[in-house]
């Protein structure tokens, strides 16, 4: 399968054309418009800081549907007796930044300055969200992602 080169125009090839690993395109930018088009088509950026932007669309994707989450009895019991608290959208900037920093202490991070700025823009437009885990007032964990429709 060919890998398509993106330019300044906001477009993507048909996701069915992704290679066997899911690589679909290279280039383009992380503008809000392009990211929205990407995510609505199951495409996402993932690349090393020294490389051009790579756009992926693997055949299988992990999605969370918040309306369908089932919290087990043991998890409810744990949550009732732990000093950890969970919040949503209380500190998006620190969640994405800390995800980046923790990776830098190991082998580097695919979350570049440009990526961090792009997802902060999405959050400011209510298109991304974060889940935070706190121990007292200390942020000890979290996740972030794009939320379009009922999927996250």
Name each model feature, range by range.
Residues 1-152:
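N-acyltransferase acceptor-side catalytic subdomain
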């Amino acid at each position: 399968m060919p890998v398509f080169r993106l330019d300044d125009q906001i477009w993507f090839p048909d996701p069915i054309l992704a290679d066997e690993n899911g690589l679909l395109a290279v280039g383009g930018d992380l503008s809000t418009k392009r990211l929205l088009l990407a995510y609505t088509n199951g495409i996402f950026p993932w690349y090393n800081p020294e490389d051009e932007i790579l756009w992926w669309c693997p055949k299988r994707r992990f999605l969370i549907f918040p309306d369908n989450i089932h919290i087990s009895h043991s998890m409810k019991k744990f949550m009732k007796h732990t000093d950890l608290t969970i919040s949503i959208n209380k500190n998006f900037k620190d969640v994405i930044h800390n995800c980046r920093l923790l990776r830098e202490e190991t082998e580097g991070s695919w979350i570049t300055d440009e990526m961090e700025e792009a997802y902060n823009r999405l959050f400011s437009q209510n298109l991304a969200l974060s889940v935070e885990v706190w121990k007292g007032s200390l942020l000890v964990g979290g996740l972030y992602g794009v939320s379009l429709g009922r999927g996250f």
